[in-house]
Design a protein with these regions (language model features):
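N-terminal [4Fe-4S]-dependent radical SAM core
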Residues: 6-11, 134-177, 190-195, 217
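Immediate flanking context of iron-sulfur cluster ligation sites
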Residues: 12-13, 35-36, 87-121, 171-176
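Iron-sulfur cluster-binding cysteine motifs and their immediate structural context
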Residues: 20, 24-36, 42-58, 112-122, ...
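Glycine-rich phosphate/adenylate-binding loop and adjacent beta-alpha elements
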Residues: 44, 104-145
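Short, contiguous acidic and Ser/Thr-rich linear segments
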Residues: 72-81
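Short, structural beta-strand-to-alpha-helix junction motif
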Residues: 81-85, 128
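Conserved alpha-helical substructure of the radical SAM core
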Residues: 192-223
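Conserved AdoMet/S-adenosylmethionine-binding subsite of the radical SAM
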Residues: 212-321
Length: 321
């Protein structure tokens, strides 16, 4: 059977010796297939006490469900996510950081994986398939969405905030923080934001209106977006900066706080073109071994790619902007 040729299928179980019943898996990173794990692995990535473990399982080939992808009927195992079903039938996702649909955070926060499910934009990475589900791959007619925290005024800013603007007495930026990240840093300072998949998602315009309101209220010199990782939902981020830049004075800093892992030259150019004028990149270190420990990325090749892209982004911004 064709799907048996695909890579192994894993589900998640609770290690009760590590679980402290903190409620994170109910209040922040919720399960969308409760009682019948489909292997999205969101809770595995998100659990702050590492109380989730992977267990090798199998695709339920005895219980197939019908799904319609752009009107074409396919039969897939019932115990998979929409994203997994798409991969099983041979549909590839776009690279992380591209404008197309991509599996970026895999925890449901960034919405970069969203497709049209039964006429509504929904995340493919954590949504289980169900019999009769209709999935559309063209999302251009829908406003991009993302889970966002804030805005809040900030005293110190972030990566790339000019040091001379910071006096620790006045608010220097009005900031928002977006959910979802392509790294797995165990020391993440915004853990509750990064792994949030339950909050109501917002459009770039909705967030733009809020952040501009508080920017004017607190008279900050900059507007900032951090995370999580802002760059992994490219459509959303570009539209956010376009909206904000068209409604505030040019002297206002429009600040991107990024890990730089997907900030390619064309991406940087596109952000600058829509008004982003303050790009802060954090490569984190120089050695790939250190990077793997800091970011939680076990795949050395991927870690090397991310580290190299981040440093190249620093150089490109410095040389050109």
């Amino acid at each position: 059977v064709w799907w048996l040729l695909i890579s192994k299928h894993y589900v998640v179980k609770v290690n009760h010796s590590k679980c402290v019943h903190c409620g994170f898996c109910n209040l922040v990173s919720s399960c969308y297939s409760l009682g019948d794990c489909v292997g999205c692995l969101s809770c595995f990535y998100a659990c702050p006490y590492e109380a989730r473990e992977l267990v090798e399982s199998h695709l339920d080939t005895s219980n197939l469900v019908r799904v319609y992808i752009d009107g074409i009927e396919f039969k897939v195992p019932r115990n998979v996510t929409v994203a997994k079903a798409l991969e099983l039938i041979g549909i590839s996702f776009n690279p992380v950081g591209s404008r197309g649909v991509s599996l970026a955070c895999r925890t449901g926060g960034c919405w970069a994986c969203a497709v049209v499910i039964d006429s509504t934009l929904e995340r493919s990475c954590i949504t289980p398939v169900r019999d009769g589900m209709r999935v559309g791959l063209d999302v251009e007619g829908f406003k991009p969405l993302r889970i966002v925290h804030g805005p809040e005024p900030h005293l110190v800013g972030g990566k790339g905030t000019p040091w001379w603007e910071v006096n620790y007495l006045e608010y220097v930026e009005t900031a928002v923080w977006v959910a979802g990240c392509n790294l797995r840093c165990p020391q993440c300072q915004n853990y509750h934001v990064t792994y949030d998949n339950v909050s109501t998602p917002m459009t770039p315009e909705e967030v733009g209106r809020l952040v501009i309101h508080y920017h004017r209220r607190y008279r900050t010199k900059g507007i900032a977006i951090s995370g999580g990782e802002p760059t992994i939902n490219r459509r959303w981020l570009v539209e956010f900066f376009r909206y904000v830049s068209s409604r505030v004075e040019s002297r206002v800093r429009k600040h991107l706080d990024s890990n730089g892992t997907v900030l390619t030259r064309d991406y940087i150019d596109e952000l600058v073109d829509v008004g982003c004028n303050n790009i802060g990149v954090e490569p984190k270190c120089v050695r790939v071994e250190t990077y793997m420990r800091v970011t939680g990325i076990d795949d050395r090749e991927l870690a090397m790619k991310y580290l190299q892209t981040a440093w190249e982004a620093v150089k490109y911004v410095y040389d050109n902007y």
